[in-house]
UniProtKB/Swiss-Prot annotation:
It is found in: Mitochondrion intermembrane space. It comes from the Eukaryota. Binds 1 heme c group covalently per subunit. The modification N6,N6,N6-trimethyllysine is found at K79. GO terms for molecular function: electron transfer activity; heme binding; metal ion binding. This is Cytochrome c. The gene is CYC1. Gene3D superfamilies: Cytochrome c-like domain.
Amino acid sequence: MPAPYEKGSAKKGATLFKTRCLQCHTTEAGGAHKVGPNLNGVFGRHSGQAEGYSYTDANKQKGALWEAQTMSDYLENPKKYIPGTKMAFGGLKKAKDRNDLVTYLLSATK
């Protein structure tokens, strides 16, 4: 079972985002989708729901409500959390890294 989400360092999370996520995702309001969807407004939304992005059926059917804990669980191993996702990212195995990244995303995607 994944570790419970705990608030981490948004600064360290920003660095993780730049090195591990930015190639495929944006966070700013009105930002374009890249290989992956723009993450602006992701929290409080269900998986597979970013307008204008083409998701796999698996992602749409999962119906996960993106909150800090579900995002952390997903980021540990995306292909295990949503079998059939096209997200190529292998995941963040360390709970501290996930906490930092989710803490950053909570502020960067508002």
